[in-house]
Structure formats: structure tokens, C-alpha cells
A protein has these predicted regions:
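Carbohydrate transferase catalytic cores enriched for Leloir-type hexosyltransferases
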Residues: 1-217
């Protein structure tokens, strides 16, 4: 099977990019029976070690990670170029790891899109700075749902909100829980623990989950 994947949010520094990088890297390492075709709008060398992965770089006026942000939107011509690239590839299915970077796919091609939650729809006043940004986000979400055969999300609670606030059909939503990145791990290094406690005063005997950033060796 030849599986097409939107990888234009690979360089996103927030959750969308982290999820995409973690999921695809693990998938390519575990599954060598299928061929994967990635569609990007930037040079991508991170997956060159995988012989069963092909990267198709599509020219764009601005990378998705710059264009798909608050108070901005992607060029229709850039999305058309991505559509044509997907339409011209011999794919069996198309997958979008994040609705954030979604673009139209051919209607005849089975498509799956990940919708992580409905926070933007539930609390729009906290997310959008203008009616314009809210309008384009809502339009993209509605088109992505309509264009997809299946929707992937991460929890039953997220599924319920996607149904309630976005209007997706419950029977079209599948749930797959997320695994932590190997970088997140329990430490027994007492020096790090003491330093973390010094930065964030804690009470003795109480358990905490702390995010601690260390330099790579």
C-alpha cells in the first residue's frame, strides 16, 4: 500500500509538529511493509534513512509553518499545488496528521485527518484575535471534515467535543491514544531534582510532574 502523508507541519514547534514528527518517525521505524509518500513545502532530510519513504517537495510562496498562523492564511495557489501533487501520485490513502496544515485532497482518494480537539470552537474568544482568523479556521475545519472519510482524535472527551462543537458525525471518529516522546522520562538524578525544586518551590512528600529542559549532549 502506498500511503500519502501531509508533512508540511513537520517544522512546527508546537504540538502539531511534535505530534507529526513523533508519530511518523515511530511509524517508519515499525512498519516497513508499506510505502510512504510525504508531501512537504520545505527541504526535508530527516527521513532520508528510510528506504520505504519518498519525499515530494512542492514549491510554495511561503512554508505552511509561516502562513498557517494567527491573522494569516495559506495562499490558495499553494494549496492548489499541493492538491495537484497528491492527485498526481499513485496513492491508496491520504493522511493528515494535523488539521492545522490540511489542504484539499482528491475526493476519490480515501482520506484520514487528525483533529486533536475542539478548543478553538469551544473557546473562540480566547483563541482568535479577529473575526477574519476565526472565519478562515472554521472554513478549513469544515472543509477538512467534509473531505475526509475518517477522523482521528486522541480521547473520548475530545471526540465528544468534536461532535458537539464542530458537528462531525460520531461514527466517523476513531480514537488512538498518544504515547510520550522518549525524551520525557523519570529521572533519579538528585542534582536535577534539587535544581528543579529550587526553581519551583514544592512541599515535601507531594508528587509533581515537572517539565525540565536539558541540553543535548
Amino acid at each position: 500500500m502506498n500511503i500519502g502523508i501531509d508533512a508540511t507541519c513537520w517544522w512546527n514547534n508546537r504540538g502539531f509538529g511534535r505530534f507529526t514528527r513523533g508519530l511518523l518517525t515511530a511509524l517508519f521505524e515499525l512498519d516497513t511493509h508499506h510505502h510512504y509518500t510525504l508531501f512537504t513545502d520545505q527541504p526535508m532530510a530527516d527521513v532520508s534513512r528510510f528506504s520505504h519513504v519518498t519525499v515530494i517537495e512542492v514549491h510554495s510562496s511561503r512554508p505552511t509553518t509561516e502562513a498557517a498562523v494567527a491573522d494569516s492564511n495559506r495562499s490558495p495557489f499553494d494549496m492548489l499545488r499541493l492538491y495537484r501533487a497528491v492527485a498526481g501520485a499513485p496513492l491508496d490513502i491520504m493522511y493528515f496528521p494535523a488539521v492545522y496544515s490540511w489542504f484539499p485532497a482528491p475526493l476519490k482518494l480515501p482520506t484520514v485527518v487528525t483533529v486533536h480537539d475542539a478548543i478553538a470552537e469551544h473557546y473562540p474568544k480566547l483563541i482568535f484575535s479577529s473575526w477574519r482568523s476565526r472565519f478562515f479556521w472554521t472554513l478549513k475545519i469544515k472543509l477538512a471534515i467534509w473531505n475526509s472519510d475518517r477522523i482521528l482524535t486522541m480521547s473520548e472527551a475530545a471526540k465528544e467535543e468534536i461532535v458537539e462543537y464542530i458537528g462531525a458525525r460520531a461514527e466517523s471518529i476513531d480514537i488512538a491514544s498518544e504515547a510520550p516522546n522518549p525524551l520525557f522520562r523519570r529521572t533519579t538524578d538528585q542534582v536535577l531534582i534539587a535544581a528543579a525544586r529550587a526553581r519551583r518551590p514544592t512541599r515535601s512528600g507531594t508528587h509533581y510532574c515537572l517539565r525540565w529542559r536539558t541540553r543535548a549532549a
